[in-house]
Amino acid sequence: MFASMAVGGALEWDELHLFHADSPLGPWRPHRRNPVKSDVRSSRPAGSLFEWQGSLCRPAQDCSRRYGYAISVNRILRIDTEEYREVEVSRILPGWDDSVLGVHTLNMIDGLTMMDCLRMRSRFR
């Protein structure tokens, strides 16, 4: 399980923690290297893992400018009880539409892509 947690003064979008279990019902055990990542640009989970170009990928929120500013797509290089490594392979920035202020969530499954965005909208429309 991937999780973001506020531990030891960190914000809940600064660090990535992993947990593993033999059953979905637990007991859940923390990864021995938690937090496995400390980077406000790519730690907070932003959707489910997905396969892309033959690799397992993890979407993450880039909260460097504000909460849910952009999406970092990270290819998982290694994941086991001893180690976790990933590398950024793509980014989705909010600039593709003038009204979009942030890109919060990315999910891809069975050829369908879903994104959750923050948009500027007039209250008086």
Segments from the language model and where they lie:
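Carbohydrate-active catalytic/glycan-binding domains of CAZyme proteins
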Residues: 1-125
